[in-house]
Amino acid sequence: MKTEISTADSLRDPPSNGLKADSELVIREDIDQFLPSEVSSLGSDHQNDGEDSDTDSDNFLQDPEDDVDEESTGRGTVTTTSTSTESRGRPSSCIFVASLAAALSDDELCLSVTENFKKYGDLARVKVLRDNANRPYAFVQYNNDHDAKHALIRAQGTLLNGRRLRCEPAKVNRTLYLKNQQSIDFNEISQICEKFGGLEQIVPDRTDNQYTRRYTYPISSANSWFVQFVYRDDAIRAYANLRTDPNWIIEWAQNINVPKNYNLLHKSKFKSSKYHQNNGIINNDGSNNNDNNNSNNNNREDSRRNGDVIEEECGHVHGSDSEEKLTSDGIYDDEDKDSEITIDKRSIFVGQLDKETTREELNRRFSTHGKIQDINLIFKPTNIFAFIKYETEEAAAAALESENHAIFLNKTMHVQYKEVGGRHNRKFSGKNGGSNFNHHQFFSTRSGKTFTGPELNLAPPPINMYRKMSGGSQQESETMMPYMPMGPMPMGPPPPNAASLSDFDMFPPSYSTFMKGMMPLRRKSMPNSWSSPSSKSVNSENESVNGGDENSELPSEIPESSGRYNAANSFTTYNNSSAGNSNNNNNNNNSNSNKSQYKKRYARRSSYGYNEVPPKPYYFQPYYYHPMQYHMGPMGPLHPSQGSAGNHHPYMMVYPMSPPPPSGLDGSMIPPPINVSQSHAANHGSTHVHANEFISNDTGDINEDNKAYSLDY
């Protein structure tokens, strides 16, 4: 089905494939696809109101008493069916109140603000919110501008709960930023948006316009537009309807402030009235054919002057499949609806209700916005919520705007549209989910623009169009290092060519089976036992504090008097010293180091060269006691003497540790013979041992300073 899109003031030039454009046949499916069935367009009822609707855009913010049943727009008059202007509340009648007491709850603040501001005028509602820093603020909505201005003057600087209030006119965001892959004319964008409510401003975005350097601002055709509504709930309803179409980019933007001549809604009042009378959509009797022909010829010249040439086959309404249908929301009826999210614009979700809530109370509260079809109140053990369905979209939008964050039974409610379906992932996607439009190529920012027009400043969207991500925060979802248990690790065998343990690492990567799949990064909270070029100073500091061992290249700066070691309060490490070396346990980590020392040793992550030196695995040393010297009798056949038969060799009694040392060690791994005094030489080979052999005046070489060891069994 080939569709021709009607422009507001001109006919499109025929496409390159030779299709003949029929100026009398205009199909408006591209506009009506975004509109629900119950929202009527500005049809023939307004064809004679064109000249009478030349109202200034500044007259939109007038008192509600002047238009109880109708709201005036620059394009005509839009009649409100189910929501009166008193219940909606104009943005000009809203006050922003800051500097509230953060110690109070939102419910208490809402009640106190209501009691304080209702004395200044007819109060409609009060909402209390908090920012990211947990600072509370409130929006106070009055029913007319006079009371709002009176409250701004009288309430400024007054005390409430021990705090001086700061009052300002509320900046109610009600502007949409619309972007399409095709260039859209001003009248088309106005027809699409004005059917959701009254409009204040329609301003083209100059940034993405392809005729930036050729023509002056403002232009009548662009790919992206700023549309500001009179009421926020109308903007919310338009946002919910248009955002579900994959060919549109709809963003909730901050309000724009441009001069009147940049507002095309104000400049084109006369053209818009001509459009309603002569575009052929309203008049079907042919009475204005001459006017149509003349206006079409003139508009065709204006279109060529502005470079406004668009193909008649629109990319988002084309298709040869007759079975392809559009829903009222403008979404293709695919078979993968489970993967997309839809908004039921007649139903609202009401959460955070009080446990005493009943259907009658909900009906009494929410029926003020429109006629209710159904109320589904659900009680959960920890949550109470309800789904309320209205007969019209206007009533649901008014309830969403009025009741969200409002007080009901002394609790703050949470109100939003009812969501149906899964995650929305169909933006710029084709019939079968394939991408048919490259957003970044087409909408790339162009340099050399000659006009500084309104810029897009995004604002938080009023409704949640997508589901929240489950799980923890981003920091919790980061890949963490594997946890290393605190316990003894088996010592791998040395390489074949290694002469001693000092010639190779304790656990090289090839011998570390438990470190498979370990990432080459290290968490800041975990100490490391490997050295990098940037951490040599840190390791040097540790070795100087711990004393090092006798074969260390860095001398110890700690005096010998401070070298007493308590074996019960530390973890010792394997090093290249023998079992009888008194310094074999000095290379350790001080478990009692304070926080400042920890920060010194382990600097920031940016100071480590991760990709320069591969990390060594973490190793937690097993606990063992110091070796003690005990002189034994003659060695039996199962314990041959390590020295000659004529030398007395004491047996080094070492407490066992798991696992036992591997067999087949090199000769350098065996402790060397220890020289003993000649007075004990005669004891070698005797049948009994004298008691004085175990006195403390032994002259062995293991402990030359006769340092006492505190053994904790």
Swiss-Prot record:
Biased composition (Polar residues): 563-574
Gene3D superfamilies hit by this protein: 3.30.70.330
Signal peptide limits: none
GO biological process terms on file: meiotic cell cycle; mRNA splicing, via spliceosome; premeiotic DNA replication; reciprocal meiotic recombination; sporulation resulting in formation of a cellular spore
Region (Disordered): 1-90, 276-337, 524-609
GO molecular function, one term: snRNA binding
Domain RRM, residue spans: 93-172, 346-420
Effect of residue 96 to L: Leads to absolute sporulation defect
Pfam families registered for this protein in UniProt: RRM_1
Name listed for the protein in its UniProt record: Meiotic activator RIM4
Annotated CDD domains: RRM1_RIM4_like, RRM2_RIM4_like, RRM_SF
